[in-house]
Amino acid sequence: MKWVTFISLLFLFSSAYSRGVFRREAHKSEIAHRFNDVGEEHFIGLVLITFSQYLQKCPYEEHAKLVKEVTDLAKACVADESAANCDKSLHDIFGDKICALPSLRDTYGDVADCCEKKEPERNECFLHHKDDKPDLPPFARPEADVLCKAFHDDEKAFFGHYLYEVARRHPYFYAPELLYYAQKYKAILTECCEAADKGACLTPKLDALEGKSLISAAQERLRCASIQKFGDRAYKAWALVRLSQRFPKADFTDISKIVTDLTKVHKECCHGDLLECADDRADLAKYMCEHQETISSHLKECCDKPILEKAHCIYGLHNDETPAGLPAVAEEFVEDKDVCKNYEEAKDLFLGKFLYEYSRRHPDYSVVLLLRLGKAYEATLKKCCATDDPHACYAKVLDEFQPLVDEPKNLVKQNCELYEQLGDYNFQNALLVRYTKKVPQVSTPTLVEISRSLGKVGSKCCKHPEAERLPCVEDYLSVVLNRLCVLHEKTPVSEKVTKCCSESLVDRRPCFSALGPDETYVPKEFNAETFTFHADICTLPETERKIKKQTALVELVKHKPHATNDQLKTVVGEFTALLDKCCSAEDKEACFAVEGPKLVESSKATLG
């Protein structure tokens, strides 16, 4: 993704643009400094998240012990910065605690080998061993009365367990945001545990909170993957576009400065430096509030809130109105006689300014689409500025963007029409079939997970007004496809997936969309056991029952990748009828024993 190097100078061209927010005096004790800055409550939470994200299998009690040891050290260092171990880096402090665990080798295997390395290589090694799909049971929410009793009995331990359980399942969860969600969780419990019907109060509120927190986790995973796989500049390019859309009245200098500082914040959190990340995030929010008159009047609604809510509020702000009377982009970037001169003298700055100007005028475009346009503009200038008549060569460059714009617009139109025709569940099934045919080598659980997530784009985005659909759809799909890429990178099985995931961050979605059925795939043998069901399926919650049916659908496609939609629809219909019949029978198991083999035979006959 070489094109994103054009952002480099943009964030380096003047130290004035990055002065102020993160310029701190050197501290004798880093841990004392961070403890003082973030406060004891947030310090304890961030240390717990740090250990939970590194050591995903350890019991909570073991983490609580480590957190106490680190907190006691921090307090000792606040009292006397010259005390023993107070001059250690935070990586040294956390890494030494991890490496001192007697059970490290037995529980984590190769992670123990990291302890033979010195910092910073040791921390990089720990990061490499974070598991995006840990072998942990699904998080089960207790009954309302049990939940409220645990909350009232020991509030501190209750929220410690919450941070621990979420962090170890999501090792890249944006730590300051996880503290925010814990705060929201507390507010819900405080209200609902006093209600007459606790369950009726808790369930919808906790469902909504869980949904938002899962999206937040996936968004941060994309940021971290972007930084880890494509470098800081890839994230800076993304942030430049998004902030230019959100704050179109802010000037280029302000946007550049915020981008630089925001990149530092996310790089720290992605690198496991959660105390620094939370501290710097608070400083950035403070800076933006101090300069709200030049950035956005919308900031006013956020800036009087406590720090966790303030930063969350700023992140969630809607786009400002585009300023009236902006000149056409073509004036500076096509018609100006010095386009090539400006480009060649300061390529990064000039192209960064182009992205800023184009993005602030197009809140109706997705971030990745705008980055594709930046890529196309750069390629045109690179070619044309080497010719005898550059202007004649690049005069139509903005018109040449149209196919790049039309492609995602058509994708959104077609898929939203399909969603409206099929509804949630059947739309997911259509995507299941589509993606199983594209990349049948991917494991069935991953295909089910990803296709269900892709299918949610319908309910999430298709009901939006036309102007909001494209950014909603494409930016959501970027997050979901990143999950596929992250899981596939650990256990690669498909060259097509590797290619789409590795070549270009902004072209991932078009790459996957362009994939046709894999004609090289050797179909799986028919396994009757895969399609054999028992009475226990009848007692499963509706969501889990749907997942069982979708798992069977993926296996059908892997067995018969050339099956028509009508054939698959027939088999799925027969399967649904079997469930309805046997789950209504008096002797459910006997029904499945008799009717199940009939389904297997009829399915084989239907599919040929």
Curated annotation (Swiss-Prot):
Domain Albumin residues, every copy: 19-210, 211-403, 404-601
Location of Phosphoserine modifications: S29, S82, S89, S297, S443, S513
Gene name as annotated: ALB
Residues noted as binding Cu cation in the record, renumbered to the chain: H27
Single GO MF annotation: enterobactin binding
Top-level taxon of origin: Eukaryota
GO biological process, one term: negative regulation of mitochondrial depolarization
Residues where Ca(2+) 1 binds: E30, E268, D273, E276
Protein source organism: Oryctolagus cuniculus
PANTHER family cross-referenced by the UniProt entry: ALBUMIN, SERUM ALBUMIN-RELATED
Sites where the protein binds Ca(2+) 2: D37, D279, D283
Name listed for the protein in its UniProt record: Albumin
Propeptide: 19-24
Residues involved in Zn(2+) binding: H91, H271, D273
Modified residues (Phosphothreonine): T107, T444, T446, T570
Modification after translation, per record: Phosphorylated by FAM20C in the extracellular medium.
Record's subunit section: Interacts with FCGRT; this interaction regulates ALB homeostasis. Interacts with TASOR. In plasma, occurs in a covalently-linked complex with chromophore-bound alpha-1-microglobulin; this interaction does not prevent fatty acid binding to ALB.
Family: Belongs to the ALB/AFP/VDB family.
